[in-house]
Amino acid sequence: MFNSWGRDPIAELVRPIDVMGRKSELLLGRTEHAVREESTSVIRGIRHDGGSAPSVDDIRDALELAYPGLVFVGWSAATLHGIEYAEGHRPEIWLPSQVRRQGVVVRCGRLPPEDVVAVEGRVTTSVVRSAVDLARFAEGDEKIVGVDQFIRIDRQGRSLTTKPAILGYLDTHPRLYGANRVREVLDESSTGAHSPWETYSRLVVHRSGLDFFRPQQPVPGTPFHVDLGSARYRVAIEYDGGYHRSKEQQRIDIARWNAITDQRWTIIRVTSPMLLSGRAAFLDRVARELRARGWRGPSPTVPPLKLPTIHRLNTVMEDETAGQILHNGVQFG
């Protein structure tokens, strides 16, 4: 017998007991104390032999063992589709009926079969549906981070999906819950963000009123682009994260910055602390540079930045995306 996704639930449950299983399975021939000493909890109720911390794949295996009919959705789907910075979030699954499980985001509701695909042997939502779900359910401005990563154009001119494809999905699903939220996210999304903090930098600058700064702005006379740039005023804004700390990257950056400033551009570097608690000073610096180059617009306003609940400087590295704090059993559909 196969379930609606074409999987054999019996085959899914046939796993070597000495690798992973429910506690009752691991007890065969062993005491409860021995099981606790010789195995490690992967998710509540499922353990694997050995003392090593469970990997992401271990957690996926355990969830599939517990729920043979699951579909990986949201950030879990994004990870399977190769989205950078998607790891670090709680596992997120869809089930045909409501359940609650500690540490797992569980969604339910209508999920059309055509929105379900297999990736790396896992059952997950399609690329477009995964992007739509992040736009509906991710926390705060991580909605925009997620969609940015799905539509980001790489050096070969490729992206996983596009804004028109996502809008097309909404057009063919007119009663989809949260569709207006998806459209709002798309309005602020961009194909030019290479990391979450580049997204946050753009949101702060654009929401302040300086929306003429272009993501991945080419610098004439050089082979380079800048994270955000105004070609008219020759002002560039560059996010300076941990990636730029290595000696080799600093050497590359200095040569690049020299080439850009040789074209009479100025470069303003921004860091995560500035975006989190120094937005007023950062935007004032940008405005002063613009005015020195002939800009006569109104002073920028300091906008909100809706970061995920646990995204704090003392707990999350500045180049990482934060895990989201969500209630289990959120309605899906």
Regions found by a protein language model. Give the residues of each.
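Short gly/ser-rich loop at a beta-strand->alpha-helix junction or flexible surface loop bordering the NTP-binding
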Residues: 1-178, 291-333
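Surface segments flanking catalytic/ligand-binding clefts of nucleic-acid enzymes
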Residues: 4, 16-20, 24, 155-333
